[in-house]
């Protein structure tokens, strides 16, 4: 654990590290939970620690088995709607917001704007990674309160079978960019009976670590 923590501190941009500690550690985990407990009594209902929302149903990929493609690209939350969700959430003590889709980075300008306006909150996007570029990394460093989970289904053959030719290389490039810029990110792994051995292998974990990943979520195919 100490090796992990030391590497995280050494390789993370100072502003990003500070914002993560303040927003996720203090605001969400400490101050927010105190407010949540009070609001549960006031409203006599459960209040979650985080809110998950889909900025858009649009996606630049068409992955095998993904339900998002069935919804097309016309379902979108406006910036004002997302802003309202976060504003109301903060009143209840919620300071952590996750975004899925679709591909949330189709709306990356609005997401950055949201991070900027609510700079005491932590934001996290589940993304395919193909829209990550240096300009976006610069914006992530500037706001400091946005992290990513990048989808990866295993090694090149398995990943590109589901996501399309060339996506594996784009994902590794995105991971390298994020790592070089001192940004915090992890991976989202969808496992099936076909890739389970690969995505639980030491070689796969070594690949994630080599390219700067800090954590991994594992989901079964739904």
Where do the PLM segments sit?
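Conserved alpha-helical substructure of the radical SAM core
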Residues: 1-135
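A short, flexible beta-alpha/helix-coil linker loop
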Residues: 69-73, 155-157, 222
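Radical SAM/AdoMet-radical enzyme domain recognition
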Residues: 82-99, 107-220
């Amino acid at each position: 654990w100490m090796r992990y923590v030391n590497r995280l501190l050494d390789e993370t941009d100072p502003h990003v590290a500070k914002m993560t500690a303040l927003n996720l550690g203090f605001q969400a985990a400490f101050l927010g939970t105190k407010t949540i407990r009070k609001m549960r009594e006031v409203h006599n209902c459960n209040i979650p620690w985080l809110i998950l929302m889909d900025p858009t149903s649009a996606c630049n990929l068409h992955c095998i088995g993904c339900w998002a493609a069935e919804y097309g690209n016309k379902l979108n939350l406006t910036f004002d709607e997302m802003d309202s969700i976060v504003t109301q959430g903060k009143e209840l003590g919620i300071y952590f917001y996750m975004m899925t889709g679709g591909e949330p980075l189709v709306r990356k300008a609005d997401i950055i704007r949201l991070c900027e306006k609510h700079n005491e909150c932590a934001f996290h996007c589940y993304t395919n990674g193909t829209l990550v570029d240096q300009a976006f990394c610069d914006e992530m460093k500037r706001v400091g309160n946005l992290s990513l989970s990048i989808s990866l289904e295993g090694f090149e053959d398995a990943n590109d079978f589901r996501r399309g030719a060339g996506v594996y290389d784009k994902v590794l490039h995105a991971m390298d960019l994020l790592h070089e810029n001192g940004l915090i990110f992890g991976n989202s792994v969808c496992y099936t009976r076909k890739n389970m051995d690969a995505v639980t292998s030491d070689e796969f974990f070594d690949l994630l670590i080599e390219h700067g990943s800090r954590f991994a979520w594992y989901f079964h195919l739904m």
